Amino acid sequence: MSKDDVIEMQGTVLESLPNAMFQVELESGHKILAHISGKLRMNFIRILPGDKVTVELSPYDLTRGRITWRAK
């Protein structure tokens, strides 16, 4: 899947789950399961409930995503 195929959305982290998974509520109101991207994991970026994040969604599965950015 190329970079052009992903859907980027903004959301808020609701809760932290095991294995670096997070429950994220998108601006549209949908709740998805998201994991941290490799760059955030490598640089030890902490993500806590209440943080605003940017999530990439695959057009094939809109219930799972990848957190690519944490807003300051």
Swiss-Prot record:
Domain of life, per lineage: Bacteria
S1-like domain mapped to chain residues: 1-72
Disulfide bonds: none
Any one GO molecular function term: rRNA binding
Record's keyword terms, sorted: Cytoplasm, Initiation factor, Protein biosynthesis, RNA-binding, rRNA-binding
Transcription found in the keyword field: no
Stored SMART domains: S1
Annotated signal peptide: none
Localization per record: Cytoplasm
TM regions (residue ranges): none
Matches recorded under InterPro entries: NA-bd_OB-fold (IPR012340), RNA-binding_domain_S1_IF1 (IPR006196), S1_domain (IPR003029), TIF_IF1 (IPR004368)
Annotated Gene Ontology cellular component terms: cytosol
PANTHER family tied to this protein: TRANSLATION INITIATION FACTOR IF-1, CHLOROPLASTIC (PTHR33370:SF1)
Quaternary data: Component of the 30S ribosomal translation pre-initiation complex which assembles on the 30S ribosome in the order IF-2 and IF-3, IF-1 and N-formylmethionyl-tRNA(fMet); mRNA recruitment can occur at any time during PIC assembly.
Protein task: One of the essential components for the initiation of protein synthesis. Stabilizes the binding of IF-2 and IF-3 on the 30S subunit to which N-formylmethionyl-tRNA(fMet) subsequently binds. Helps modulate mRNA selection, yielding the 30S pre-initiation complex (PIC). Upon addition of the 50S ribosomal subunit IF-1, IF-2 and IF-3 are released leaving the mature 70S translation initiation complex.
Annotated family: Belongs to the IF-1 family.
Protein name: Translation initiation factor IF-1
Organism taxonomic ancestry: Bacteria, Bacillati, Bacillota, Clostridia, Eubacteriales
